[in-house]
């Protein structure tokens, strides 16, 4: 029997209990992602931008630094939204505490829309239809993910913790045995089905994240499938023990970063 799935509404409130730990423990996005936004998606000075599910701002700060202004960040969790505001005291940034479905954004007003490791929490078809309405002709949409895991490489820590972590899945798991952010065929097909984009493209990179036992526990504490468990503390203690006793305090997680971009047709 496949694992149960966290409801979208529950998942959207799963990350705000400790925003500072989330911001510190989650890895940054590779530089090539933002380089692509600059070279392909016209990110630069004065790019009118919206960001879906901005969280604590792991991508927001980079967007602001590269010229996204004004930038409207949409974040449904008020705790994450407050952290985002306080960490980015930039007059170009506006934070809307709202689900994207309900966000008040002007149609045709944006040069760029972005979502970083958050788009799987939305209904893809409905969200893409709204995104297309918000972008001006020639505007760009970009969704990217840092995905934990890569089946093409050995992953001993994942195998060692599989029984401990059994439980609910979340939408990032995907529907076809492929993580949502890595299901190239499905994501590109959804973009094309809108009929709103004249260019769609994707790129990926693989890399490694090296963690000690404390950083391992801190990272897993940010996973919705861990943070919402009633036995969260014992699971984190178990992860810490495995990292220390079976891996000598050095855990290597396989990472894949994926990026999907699409240009709004005239």
Residue ranges: model-predicted function:
Residues 122-131:
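A short, conserved alpha-helix within the catalytic core of class I
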Residues 103-113:
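A short acidic, Gly/Pro-enriched loop at the edge of an enzyme's catalytic core
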Residues 56, 179-266:
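Conserved Class I S-adenosyl-L-methionine
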Residues 1-44:
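Conserved class I S-adenosyl-L-methionine
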Residues 50, 56-103:
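Class I SAM-dependent methyltransferase SAM/SAH-binding core
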């Amino acid at each position: 029997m496949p694992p149960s799935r966290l409801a979208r509404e529950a998942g959207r409130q799963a990350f705000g209990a400790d925003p500072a730990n989330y911001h510190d423990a989650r890895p940054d996005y590779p530089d090539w992602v933002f380089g692509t936004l600059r070279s392909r998606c016209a990110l630069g000075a004065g790019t009118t931008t919206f960001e879906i599910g901005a969280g604590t701002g792991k991508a927001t700060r980079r967007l602001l630094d590269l010229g996204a202004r004004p930038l409207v960040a949409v974040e449904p969790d008020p705790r994450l939204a407050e952290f985002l505001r306080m960490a980015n005291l930039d007059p170009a940034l506006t934070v809307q505490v709202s689900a994207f479905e309900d966000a008040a954004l002007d149609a045709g007003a944006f040069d760029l829309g972005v979502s970083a490791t958050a788009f799987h929490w939305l209904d893809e078809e409905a969200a893409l239809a709204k995104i297309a309405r918000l972008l001006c002709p020639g505007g760009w949409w970009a969704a990217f993910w840092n995905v934990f895991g890569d089946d093409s490489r050995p992953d001993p820590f994942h195998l060692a913790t599989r029984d401990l972590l059994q439980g609910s899945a979340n939408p990032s798991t995907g529907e076809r045995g492929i993580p949502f952010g890595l299901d190239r065929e499905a994501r590109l097909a959804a973009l094309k089905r809108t009929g709103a984009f004249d260019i769609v493209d994707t790129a990926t990179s693989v890399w490694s994240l090296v963690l000690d036992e404390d950083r391992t526990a801190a990272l897993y504490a940010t996973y919705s499938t861990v943070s919402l468990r009633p036995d969260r503390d014992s699971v984190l203690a178990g992860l810490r023990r495995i990292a220390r006793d079976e891996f000598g305090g050095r855990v290597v997680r396989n990472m894949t970063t994926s990026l999907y971009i699409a240009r709004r047709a005239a």
